[in-house]
Amino acid sequence: MKTWVKIVFGVATSAVLALLVMCIVLRPSRVHNSEENTMRALTLKDILNGTFSYKTFFPNWISGQEYLHQSADNNIVLYNIETGQSYTILSNRTMKSVNASNYGLSPDRQFVYLESDYSKLWRYSYTATYYIYDLSNGEFVRGNELPRPIQYLCWSPVGSKLAYVYQNNIYLKQRPGDPPFQITFNGRENKIFNGIPDWVYEEEMLATKYALWWSPNGKFLAYAEFNDTDIPVIAYSYYGDEQYPRTINIPYPKAGAKNPVVRIFIIDTTYPAYVGPQEVPVPAMIASSDYYFSWLTWVTDERVCLQWLKRVQNVSVLSICDFREDWQTWDCPKTQEHIEESRTGWAGGFFVSTPVFSYDAISYYKIFSDKDGYKHIHYIKDTVENAIQITSGKWEAINIFRVTQDSLFYSSNEFEEYPGRRNIYRISIGSYPPSKKCVTCHLRKERCQYYTASFSDYAKYYALVCYGPGIPISTLHDGRTDQEIKILEENKELENALKNIQLPKEEIKKLEVDEITLWYKMILPPQFDRSKKYPLLIQVYGGPCSQSVRSVFAVNWISYLASKEGMVIALVDGRGTAFQGDKLLYAVYRKLGVYEVEDQITAVRKFIEMGFIDEKRIAIWGWSYGGYVSSLALASGTGLFKCGIAVAPVSSWEYYASVYTERFMGLPTKDDNLEHYKNSTVMARAEYFRNVDYLLIHGTADDNVHFQNSAQIAKALVNAQVDFQAMWYSDQNHGLSGLSTNHLYTHMTHFLKQCFSLSD
């Protein structure tokens, strides 16, 4: 999510002798009284209006030294780094003529697609209307126009071929003005999905709106077909403005239910009618039972890599397949299958990592757990067992950005041993022994401790985007020397706007409790005084593979609560959270709802021992998985919490999606893990809400965590005759957007102020 550095090693009172504290003060308070008198606290209106939001700059790379970007006046501009020249390739007038909100340049630079009429569907998916603009004659392409609305559209990597998905079928155009060639014919709404994922694959496996992939030179097009014919359907009412509500139906496999059947096909787009789509075989050890397809990576035009998972998700198989021209088929020999298995949890982190192939087109780099249980980069040439470990240590490699002939760029949380930081590293792989350099560790060190990067072709240039803890900044760098070339975005307006704001202080610390490390971020009022007592709000997510304690910049609702309302807010990363090794990550395997809750409670007790927390005014709140954890913490019977809020909580793992739930819990069957499914519900603890103030919130059109979850909590509380508060948002999904957002945060603020006896 979201400077001077000070290390404090404290020896505390006898009550906390077991507590080791390491502290970074991220936002020191201003000390000049004359300045303080002219400064104001944050207001809720500031947050709801997005007054202090920041900008980032990610170049839209189109070559090794060129990128596109949209200027402040909405012209599409091409910038050449080496010449320093820029020119407008598409005017704002052309964009405005079709109300375009997005664009895409064809690789041959002859055409641009313009996207308008954006209509959101689920988390990543949306439909839109597309227009093709011919840059050579300055006119829109007429004749054989694209149908509308389109579910997905993309250019081939070379030339100006187009592939698009319309009404769940895939179409191909050799040129934008040509008639389309229909590749699939069996697409049906909510039944068969071609080239786009169904709900569960979009949300829980692919994390994209598309399921088709061009080969590097555009010869082949691979795509997934998802068959949801036998999947149970979730149905909910959408009230709208009509006399009768309409019913939304989504094929949605819950834990233990039948899953979509997935198949992968590849078609030669040069002569698509000649042979037609060819199916890629599934590895035998995967195909013998229920399985998932997890990703596809093209290696060359005639070599492709597919990744598969068993339904249990502790075994992943990477399969490298080659095109056999004589048979016009794809061959996936067993000798090119690489197996990744976890014996202590699930395979990978949240997802199984994807390979980054080297220039020999057979060996690759991949992140997976080493023998010490930390996720690191490995080089695989023949088998996973013979993999060469590239990085090592009690920290984790996060992402491989780019591999060139002589360098590998990646991110990790190694520097100074803070798991909530991200720095960019370069390893020289063209020399022996390989040398490692941290590109970002000492760049604007006080301001920037959390980076990501975007690379041009061959890593000739790259952009760094720093997310904090100071105000975010985006910069352009030479990929050979790492020298900074220019600042792309430094958020000067935001910096000036914050000069007269009393921001809260932020500290990142860690607790060592019973051989478990609990990192936490504490947000303190601007005039914080350790001799005083403050109300405490715990903000929790706590889901497997998540991380809340990060060195990022944010001015948000909890910033306001600290700045204006004088609350202390804490975020704690307990067992099950990511980037601190498998021991912590896999501790929650097959027992969700236990250690995540225990660790929040443990942290609260340690906070009380620090002496500045009013133990009679402690609250907890969370959203989604965080709503589940906050509910269980409130119902723990500890007496620690006076009140709490759950927004769109899961209430029983039998109600949630199969792909996500079974990854961490196994199956809800008697011979697997049904007992813990039953024991981990919020409803089973209804009686324990009697001594807390509980606010339950949900959107009625939540496609992700269904309203069913909160309805069952409410029913259990009513049956137990427990008083509680509830707020629902009609026709709102999991994100509670638009005017609902303002209402939500205003309502939650009133609830907390009433709980803590704070005046309006």
Curated annotation (Swiss-Prot):
Identify the residues that bind substrate.
Answer: 203-204
Alphabetically sorted, this entry's keywords are: Angiogenesis, Apoptosis, Cell adhesion, Cell junction, Cell membrane, Cell projection, Cleavage on pair of basic residues, Cytoplasm, Disulfide bond, Glycoprotein, Hydrolase, Membrane, Protease, Secreted, Serine protease, Signal-anchor, Transmembrane, Transmembrane helix
The UniProt GO MF terms for this protein read: dipeptidyl-peptidase activity; endopeptidase activity; identical protein binding; integrin binding; peptidase activity; protease binding; protein homodimerization activity; serine-type endopeptidase activity
> Topology: which residues are Extracellular?
26-760
- What does the UniProt record report as the effect of altering residue 624 to A in this chain? Reduces dipeptidyl peptidase and gelatinolytic activities. Does not inhibit cell adhesion, migration and invasion
Positions bearing carbohydrate: 49, 92, 99, 227, 314, 679
**Mutagenesis or variant effect for residue 203 to A/D/Q:** Reduces dipeptidyl peptidase and endopeptidase activities. Does not inhibit cell adhesion, migration and invasion. Inhibits dipeptidyl peptidase and endopeptidase activities
Q: What does this protein do?
A: Cell surface glycoprotein serine protease that participates in extracellular matrix degradation and involved in many cellular processes including tissue remodeling, fibrosis, wound healing, inflammation and tumor growth. Both plasma membrane and soluble forms exhibit post-proline cleaving endopeptidase activity, with a marked preference for Ala/Ser-Gly-Pro-Ser/Asn/Ala consensus sequences, on substrate such as alpha-2-antiplasmin SERPINF2 and SPRY2.
Protein name, per record: Prolyl endopeptidase FAP
Recorded source organism is Homo sapiens
